[in-house]
Amino acid sequence: MSCISSQCFITIKSICIVLLLSITCGAVSANSNYGEALTKSLLYFEAQRSGKLPLDQRVIWRGDSALRDGSDAHVDLTGGYYDAGDNMKFGFPLAFTTTMLAWSSVEMESQLKAHQEHGNTLAALRWATDYLIKAHPEPNVLYGQVGDANLDHACWMRPEDMTTPRPSYRIDPQHPGADLAGETAAAMAAASLAFAPSDSAYAKTLISHAKELFEFAKDYPGVYHNSIPNAGGFYPSSGYEDELLWAAAWLHRATGDQTYLDHLTQASNSGGARSVFAWDDKFLGAQVLVAKLVFEGKVKNEGKMIEYKSMAEQFICNCAQKGFNNVKKTPGGLLWFLPWDNLQYTATASFALATYAKYLEAAQTSIQCPNGDVLQASDLLNLARAQVDYILGSNPKKMSYMVGYGTNYPKRPHHRGASIVSIKNDPKPVTCNGGFEAWYNNPKPNPNLLVGAIVGGPDEYDAYGDERSDFQHGEPDTVTVAPLLGVLAAIA
C-alpha cells in the first residue's frame, strides 16, 4: 500500500532519529555528555504520550491509545501523559510535571536553543497544556484523573490495546481540591511564560485558565484526594497551602498583578525550611521564585519576603552539607531523601540548585550558610552537576540511571508499554493476566527501549538490582525527568 510522500518521509526520518539515538556512546565517565542526555530526556516524554500521536512522533514503538478518554463524562480528555509505568493519567503529578517543564523552558531558554532542543521542549510542554485546557471545561470544574488506578495496576497491558475501565474523575465546588486546582493554575501560568514569545494568543488562553483555577482553589479549600479517593493510594496530598503559594508566585511572574504578590505577603505559612521539593510539596519552589524577586529589587528585602528567601537558602545549605539539617548522602555521593523513587527528589533539588545559581550570578551575590561558609553560584552549579554525573554513571555501580544512555543502564524498568512487545510488531491483544505471565515475569530485557527515562534509582547504599518487579527503585516517572531536563540544559 502506498502512502502520502510527506508521511513516508516523516516515518523514515523518525526511524533514523530513533536508531541514531539508540546508539550508545561508550562507557560513562565523569565527563558526561549532557547534551545527549538532554535530547534523550525529551524522547522519554514522547514515550509517555496518551491519545492520538502526531506524524512527527519519534518514539515509533508507541501507538495511539486511550482515544475515548472522557467519553463517560461527555468531555474530550484525550491526550496528556501517563504518569509512570502504568496507563494512568493522574492530574496532580501531571500538573507538577507541566510546571517543571515550563520552568525548565523559561529559565534555560537560551541553553535549550543552543542545543536545538527548545522546540522539542515546547512540544513536550504543549502536549501537557493542551490536555489541561480540555480538563478545565468550566471555571470551577477540573478533571483530575482518568482511569481506575486499582484496576489499572491489577493488569499488565500496553496502553494501545488496554481494556481496563477509564472513568473520569473531577473536582468542583461540591467536591473541592484546592491543591489540584492550585497546581494546575501554577502549570498554566508558568507555561504562559514559555509560550508568550512564540504564541501570544495561546499564552493568553493559559493565563485565563490559570486565573480561574487560582480563584477556584482559594474559594473551595480542601485536598483533592478526599474528592477523588481513587487517587489517594497513589498520589495523596499533604495539604494545599503550598500549591496556593506556588500558583500565586507563578501568576505574579506571568502577570505582574499585585494581587498575587499580596497573597504571598499575607500568607500565614511560608513553609519553613523544607526537606524535599516534589509533586506534593512546592513550598521550596515558591520560596525560590520569591527569592528571585528579592534579588531583582522588585520586593523589599524584609518581612515575609526575606523569610521565603532565607528558607530557600537553608534548603540549599543543607544540600551542600553546610546547614542545620544536612541532606543525607549515599557512600557514592548521591543526595538521599527518601527510599521510594529517590531520584525524583535528587532531580528537583538539583534543579533548585541550578536555578538559584543563575539568580545568584545575576545579582552578583552569594549565600551565607549557618556554619559560616559562603556558597557562590559556582558551588551550587557544581553540586547540581555532581548529582547529574552520578545519575549518568559516575557512581559505585558505574551504571547510568537514564535508560538508553551509555552502555550500562537499566534494561528492565517497571513500565508496561516498554516491557511488552510493540503493537506494531505484534498486534495480537495482550490480556490483563496474560501480560503478567508473558512479559512482567519474563527475565529478559524490555523489548522496547524507553530512551531518556530515569528510574527510581539506587538505595541508600548505592545498590540497584534492575528487577522489573522493583517499582520502588525501577519505575520511571515524568515528575523526575521534567526537572532533570532543566538541569541538563543548565550544565550542557
Curated annotation (Swiss-Prot):
<feature type="active site">
    <location>
        <position position="475"/>
    </location>
</feature>
<dbReference type="GO" id="GO:0005576">
    <property type="term" value="C:extracellular region"/>
</dbReference>
<keyword id="KW-0624">Polysaccharide degradation</keyword>
<keyword id="KW-0326">Glycosidase</keyword>
<keyword id="KW-0378">Hydrolase</keyword>
<keyword id="KW-0119">Carbohydrate metabolism</keyword>
<feature type="active site" description="Nucleophile">
    <location>
        <position position="86"/>
    </location>
</feature>
<dbReference type="Pfam" id="PF00759">
    <property type="entry name" value="Glyco_hydro_9"/>
</dbReference>
<dbReference type="InterPro" id="IPR001701">
    <property type="entry name" value="Glyco_hydro_9"/>
</dbReference>
<dbReference type="GO" id="GO:0030245">
    <property type="term" value="P:cellulose catabolic process"/>
</dbReference>
<comment type="similarity">
    <text>Belongs to the glycosyl hydrolase 9 (cellulase E) family.</text>
</comment>
<keyword id="KW-0961">Cell wall biogenesis/degradation</keyword>
<feature type="active site">
    <location>
        <position position="466"/>
    </location>
</feature>
<keyword id="KW-0964">Secreted</keyword>
<feature type="signal peptide">
    <location>
        <begin position="1"/>
        <end position="30"/>
    </location>
</feature>
<protein>
    <recommendedName>
        <fullName>Endoglucanase 15</fullName>
        <ecNumber>3.2.1.4</ecNumber>
    </recommendedName>
</protein>
<keyword id="KW-0136">Cellulose degradation</keyword>
<feature type="active site">
    <location>
        <position position="414"/>
    </location>
</feature>
<dbReference type="GO" id="GO:0071555">
    <property type="term" value="P:cell wall organization"/>
</dbReference>
<dbReference type="GO" id="GO:0008810">
    <property type="term" value="F:cellulase activity"/>
</dbReference>
<dbReference type="InterPro" id="IPR012341">
    <property type="entry name" value="6hp_glycosidase-like_sf"/>
</dbReference>
<dbReference type="InterPro" id="IPR008928">
    <property type="entry name" value="6-hairpin_glycosidase_sf"/>
</dbReference>
<dbReference type="InterPro" id="IPR018221">
    <property type="entry name" value="Glyco_hydro_9_His_AS"/>
</dbReference>
<keyword id="KW-0732">Signal</keyword>
